[in-house]
């Protein structure tokens, strides 16, 4: 069997008609876990509906529709394999909650695949002031997705077809734009492809013989292997807490950093409750250690279900335990707020698994979101497209961390009026020590 391949997560971004679904569908179709029978069914339906426009996008549309109807689709459908990696497409925009998902995301993307429409007019629409290409790229960079592959798509529909001049023009323009966002364009492969015809997706295309770089598949294989943060102190945000007869209280969540082991003494922030972990399970099997990315349930001694809540964070009592945040300062980008945001604004913050109202206590500075340079001290307000440093105070106890130390606990979405109005990363946190926190007997013995 040999060593298992490393898993990586990919997020596909780009303007609405750039061909994201066709390209992603094509990869999944050719390299993925979709059953041939399912594909044949899709093809037949597509033909009946005269959607010659294609089985690939159709595959993805079907998957999306089923996902939105709440039918859990076998997640294998969103996976495909390269020579080196197992790739999972964690979300494709166009999905209503894309921005929120990308931030509170069940997983951090290791690489963004930016799809550009190379056709006349199509490219210009995508990169224009209000095109989504800019917003998505900025979002990916702000949230720490440092690797990118850029696909110049629809090369079969440029004038003339497969035009090198058009490709060069796009590379130049997109490079200068990505540089402003913060990426280094010299490190980004620009692959000319046709997601529809299949040129340069998996095999080299003779239509593009002027291009000497990698195919999309080769570019995916060249992604730098992600480092998983198992050497950091433990952080495990709780998703749920169950009471299981004969076993007791079982909190459930995903290890974001560090390691969780049976016998460990854990402290739950923000309350400071401290207890011993009896056992750790994943998919109903006992684990000797849980690592970042593992979704686990663990049994804790002498703790009532009511003492723990979704949004609490389990940590190692002896290694930088999680604490309540009295306040924190974040770099925030306002994305779609219709008005002006000033001191006293009180939206809801979605950060890891917690969902808590916070107050914008103080707008500290307004900054240039590309260079990070300060534009104005103590601005009166921030509006759409602005970035700023903001001091926030939670209205209820919550745990957050700086983005640099614990990335998944240091990025958030600001929600208001049922949409994401801003995104942010946390620069520093003022923590407060718990008062009168309960320490169970088992934990006290181990001290």
From Swiss-Prot:
RNA-binding listed as a keyword: no
Modified residues (N6,N6,N6-trimethyllysine): 79, 187, 306, 396
Keywords: Cytoplasm, Elongation factor, GTP-binding, Methylation, Nucleotide-binding, Phosphoprotein, Protein biosynthesis
Residue(s) carrying N6-methyllysine: 261
InterPro entries in alphabetical order: EFTu-like_2 (IPR004161), G_TR_CS (IPR031157), GTP-eEF1A_C (IPR054696), P-loop_NTPase (IPR027417), T_Tr_GTP-bd_dom (IPR000795), TRAFAC_GTPase_members (IPR050100), Transl_B-barrel_sf (IPR009000), Transl_elong_EF1A/Init_IF2_C (IPR009001)
UniProt modified residues of type N6,N6-dimethyllysine: 55
Region span, G5: 194-196
Stretch list, region G3: 91-94
One MF annotation (Gene Ontology) recorded for this entry: translation elongation factor activity
Gene Ontology CC terms: cytoplasm
Region (G1): 14-21
Region (G4): 153-156
Binding site for GTP: 14-21, 91-95, 153-156
Domain called tr-type G: residue spans: 5-230
NCBIfam families given in the database record: EF-1_alpha (TIGR00483), PRK12317.1 (NF008969)
Name of the molecule in the record: Elongation factor 1-alpha
Originating species: Oryza sativa subsp. japonica (Rice)
């Amino acid at each position: 069997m040999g060593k298992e391949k490393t898993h990586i997560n990919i997020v596909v971004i780009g303007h609405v008609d750039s061909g994201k679904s066709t390209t992603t569908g094509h990869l999944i179709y050719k390299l993925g876990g979709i059953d041939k029978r399912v594909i044949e069914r899709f093809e037949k339906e597509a033909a009946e509906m005269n959607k010659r426009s294609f089985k690939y996008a159709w595959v993805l549309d079907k998957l999306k529709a089923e996902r939105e109807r709440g039918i859990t689709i076998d997640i294998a459908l969103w996976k495909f394999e390269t020579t080196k990696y197992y790739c999972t497409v964690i979300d494709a925009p166009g999905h209503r909650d894309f921005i929120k998902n990308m931030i509170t995301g069940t997983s951090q993307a290791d690489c963004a695949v930016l799809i550009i429409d190379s056709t006349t007019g199509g490219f210009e629409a995508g990169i224009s002031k209000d095109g989504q290409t800019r917003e998505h790229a900025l979002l990916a960079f702000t949230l720490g997705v440092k690797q990118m592959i850029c696909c110049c798509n629809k090369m079969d529909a440029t004038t003339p077809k497969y035009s090198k001049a058009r490709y060069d023009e796009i590379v130049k323009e997109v490079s200068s734009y990505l540089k402003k966002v913060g990426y280094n364009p010299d490190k980004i492969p620009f692959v000319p492809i046709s997601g529809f015809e299949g040129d340069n997706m998996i095999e080299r295309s003779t239509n593009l013989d002027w291009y000497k770089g990698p195919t999309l598949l080769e570019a995916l294989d060249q992604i730098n292997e992600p480092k998983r943060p198992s050497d950091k102190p433990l952080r495990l945000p709780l998703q749920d807490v169950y009471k299981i007869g004969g076993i007791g209280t079982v909190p459930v969540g995903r290890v974001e950093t560090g390691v969780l082991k049976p016998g460990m003494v854990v402290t739950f922030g923000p309350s400071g409750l401290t207890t011993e972990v009896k056992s750790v399970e994943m998919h109903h099997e006992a684990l000797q250690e849980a690592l970042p990315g593992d979704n686990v349930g663990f049994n804790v001694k002498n703790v009532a279900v009511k003492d723990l809540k979704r949004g609490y964070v389990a940590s190692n009592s002896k290694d930088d335990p999680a604490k309540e945040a009295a306040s924190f300062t974040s770099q925030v980008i306002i994305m779609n707020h219709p008005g002006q945001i000033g001191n006293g604004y009180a939206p809801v913050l979605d950060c890891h698994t917690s969902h808590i109202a916070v107050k914008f206590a103080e707008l500290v500075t307004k900054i240039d979101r590309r260079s990070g340079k300060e534009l104005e001290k103590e601005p009166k307000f921030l509006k759409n497209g602005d970035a700023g440093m903001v001091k926030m105070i939670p209205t209820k106890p919550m745990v957050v961390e700086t983005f640099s130390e614990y990335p998944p606990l240091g990025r958030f979405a600001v929600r208001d009026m049922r949409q994401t109005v801003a995104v942010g990363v946390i620069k520093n946190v003022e923590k407060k020590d718990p008062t009168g926190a309960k320490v169970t007997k088992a934990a006290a013995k181990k001290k």
